[in-house]
Amino acid sequence: MQWSTDWGLRGRMAFTMFLLFGLYLAFVGALVSFYDAGMLTVLVLMGGFSLVQYFFSDKLALRSMGARKVAPDEEPELHRKIERLSQQADLPKPTVAVADSQVPNAFATGRNQKNATVCVTSGLQRTLSDEELEGVLAHELAHVKNRDVMVMTIASFLSTIAFFVVRWGWLFAGDDRNSPPVWVAIVVSLVVWVVSFLLIRALSRYREYAADRGAASITGNPSALASALMRIDRRMDNVPKEDLRDQAEMNAFFIIPIRSGLIGKLASTHPPMDKRIEKLRELEAEMETV
């Protein structure tokens, strides 16, 4: 399988990671300057927590969705599709899971390519045709191929610390908690958290574009994924609101985020639907000319 490269997209992702790295470097310097060893101990503990979260991301995500791993004799067709697409993507076959939910969606999780899980909802299986389902599964396998769980965990780590400092930093300032430098550090942390939040969301959107492109490379059929995205989007209108609320915390994982009127474009984990469809159609035209 040949992965087609969108150098503009790669450049935007690299630039976003560069900005995050520079921001975090300055942030760590500020923390070391303003806080004593107590804060550094907390940073080490939070680093350990992030490692636990990283290594057990698949179990946490499946539990959050109420999903269960399924054997080939339980979901033979789903297993066959994922096995064939994994071979086309040059990936080990991931663990297969199903969540009993009316919300038509899917996600991939796991710390690396050898420890990945692809989960689909029963609502997704009922909603899509075989070709459309393969497009969605290929999108999730592209996330695995691109190591997106690892990338986003690394990108989010110091943002989480910045949020912690904003909430609880004054507790670790000792006798200096009322001094101006401590409050300057908290304000700096607030700025770092807001800016990094927006950069991480931008990175997430870029990686969705990359997964769409990867899915097209795996299947050779961008129109199937485009059709699946439109069908899922329409189906969301008929899903009970309580089901959507129950799964809103999984937005960043899903192929299509659960809608929320309070989330603006800058804070969204996914690109606008029309933009994704447009890029898939452009990719289809590009493939037809090759």
Identify the role of each PLM range.
Residues 141-157, 222-223:
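Catalytic Zn2+-binding segment of zinc metalloproteases
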Residues 1-7, 118, 137-141:
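Cytosolic juxtamembrane N-terminal segments of multi-pass membrane proteins
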Residues 91-115, 216-290:
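Active-site-proximal gating segments in proteases and membrane effectors
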Residues 67, 106-130, 261:
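Active-site scaffold of zinc-dependent metalloenzymes
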Residues 70, 122-135, 199, 205:
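Short pre-active-site segment immediately N-terminal to the catalytic Zn-binding motif
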Residues 77, 132, 153, 206, ...:
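Alpha-helix N-cap and coil->helix boundary residues
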Residues 58, 82, 120, 135-143, ...:
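Active-site recognition of the HExxH zinc-binding catalytic motif
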Residues 1-107, 155-209, 233-237, 285-290:
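Hydrophobic or amphipathic, alpha-helical segments that drive membrane association/targeting
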